A protein has these predicted regions:
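Short alpha-helix in the Rossmann-fold core of NAD(P)-dependent oxidoreductases
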Residues: 38-61, 68, 96-100
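A structural motif corresponding to the C-terminal end of an alpha-helix
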Residues: 52-65, 103-117
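NAD(P)H-binding glycine-rich loop region in Rossmannoid oxidoreductase-like domains
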Residues: 2-48, 52
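A conserved pocket-lining segment of Rossmann-fold NAD(P)-dependent short-chain dehydrogenase/reductase
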Residues: 142-170
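Conserved catalytic-site region of short-chain dehydrogenase/reductase
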Residues: 33, 72-82, 126-129
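Conserved beta-loop-beta element that borders a ligand/cofactor-binding pocket
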Residues: 106-135
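Short-chain dehydrogenase/reductase
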Residues: 43-47, 85-86, 92-105, 134-138, ...
Length: 172
């Protein structure tokens, strides 16, 4: 379904046919202009993506059982610099703006009294593909693999030994 999740009316109309939906996996992201310099610019749009999506599907489907919110290590402040590792789900929120906090707070409040539940996943890296975004390492690895093959080279890890031997979590 092609839908502008920032438009609540369009989201409601186009997702209305999901009356048999039982699970929602939400991993949408809208980078804001200048967001790297001012992370607070991401908050409203990314909260609204979740609000419009979940509100529409909650309205459409009486069979909804669970919403899975995919966040990430920015919850712990990874975008601000080094953070305590291993990170734990019960770690306190970092100081400063973070759209994950707004999403979690909204989803917690919206879900109260509803017959469905929700969970949050926090992978270190989320790989995937969406047109117009450079948020995935997969296309770069694919190009590296294609060039290696074309040159008759074996596919080797393109980083340092420390990165190769590190424990890391990736979700697709």
């Amino acid at each position: 379904i092609s839908v502008d999740l920032l438009d609540p009316a369009e989201a409601t109309a186009k997702l209305a046919g999901l009356e048999d939906a039982t699970h929602v996996f939400f991993a949408a992201f809208q980078p804001g202009a200048g967001a790297a310099a001012d992370y607070a610019k991401n908050i409203a749009a990314n909260r609204d993506l979740l609000v419009n999506s979940v509100s529409a599907i909650d309205k459409a489907s009486a069979r909804l059982e669970r919403v899975v919110l995919v966040t990430g290590t920015k919850y712990y402040g990874s975008h601000l610099g080094p953070y305590k590792t291993p990170a734990r789900e019960d770690d306190p929120r970092h100081a400063g703006a973070n759209y994950y906090f707004d999403q979690i707070d909204w989803l917690t409040a919206f879900q109260r009294g509803k017959p469905w539940d929700w969970v949050e996943l926090r992978p270190q890296t989320l790989c995937g593909f969406a047109p117009g975004t450079a948020m995935s390492i997969l296309p770069a690895i694919a190009v590296y693999a294609a060039i290696s093959k074309e040159l008759g080279l074996p596919l080797r890890f393109p980083g340092k030994p420390g990165a190769y031997n590190a424990i890391y979590q990736v979700t697709e």
